[in-house]
């Protein structure tokens, strides 16, 4: 398990029982250094690390060796302002949540721009617009799910860019709240082995689980620092067996949740 230890500017590696195996990276802007690493993804034996402070995606071997850098600071094509999450398609193309540019970019494996969703630099709450997108996840059927951070919703797109659905509060229109299917800032999204969608609901201190079409299924977690409690669930991932791992922001820990049978 690879964990973005953001404020320490490093990645820590654990086995699935929580034992530390190794770490790599240090705070900085050089090759092999990290500026606030965010939501990670592994593809093709490589680790893709979006760097919030360094405005780039850095690609590492699983041994921690820096292999290449994609993107640079800016608002042009293939440039980023605080990328928060990345997903990689089977063909190697990248989808990047470009936080301050209020857009999601699709890039070829070498970083060449393909297209974008959202209007650069302009936050919005209509379908296909974004207000500080934080993460992306790609389902097996090609559906792209975007955690639309301060719009308090999730948006789903077909691989060709068509908006499929959106959910979160009434009409998914930037209304936050504590109810099932509502959010108070969404910071991470992940796909389970059965295609269900898991969402980190930051200020509600919980994780919500949805069917692929956005139908609410269940939620877990509550405010606090005890087992099963969160002080802001900030990031998550789901293992092949359905186990959910959650980064518990202010509690400075990772929690492991077994799937309900």
Where are each of the predicted segments found?
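Eukaryotic scaffold repeat domains enriched in small/polar residues
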Residues: 1-261
């Amino acid at each position: 398990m690879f964990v973005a230890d953001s404020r320490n500017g490093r990645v820590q590696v654990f086995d699935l029982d929580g034992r530390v195996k190794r770490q790599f990276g240090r705070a900085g802007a050089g090759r092999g250094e990290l500026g606030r690493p965010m939501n990670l993804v592994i593809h093709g034996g490589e680790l893709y690390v979006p760097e919030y402070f360094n405005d780039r995606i850095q690609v590492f071997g699983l041994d921690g060796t820096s292999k290449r850098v994609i993107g640079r600071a800016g608002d042009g094509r293939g440039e980023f302002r605080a990328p928060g999450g990345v997903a990689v398609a089977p063909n190697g193309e990248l989808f990047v949540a470009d936080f301050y540019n209020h857009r999601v970019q699709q890039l070829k494996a070498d970083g060449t721009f393909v297209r974008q969703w959202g209007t650069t630099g302009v936050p919005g709450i209509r379908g296909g617009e974004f207000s500080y997108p934080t993460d992306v996840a790609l389902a097996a059927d090609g559906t792209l799910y975007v955690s639309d951070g301060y719009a308090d919703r999730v948006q789903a797109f077909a691989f060709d860019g068509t908006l499929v659905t959106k959910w979160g509060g009434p009409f998914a229109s930037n209304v936050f709240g504590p109810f099932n299917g509502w959010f108070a800032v969404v910071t991470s999204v992940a796909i389970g082995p059965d295609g269900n969608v898991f969402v980190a609901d930051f200020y509600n201190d919980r994780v919500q689980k949805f069917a692929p079409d956005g139908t609410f299924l269940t939620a877990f977690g509550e405010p606090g620092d005890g087992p099963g409690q969160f002080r802001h669930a900030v990031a998550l991932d789901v293992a092949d067996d359905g186990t959910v791992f959650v980064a518990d922001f202010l509690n400075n820990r990772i929690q492991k949740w077994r799937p309900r049978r």
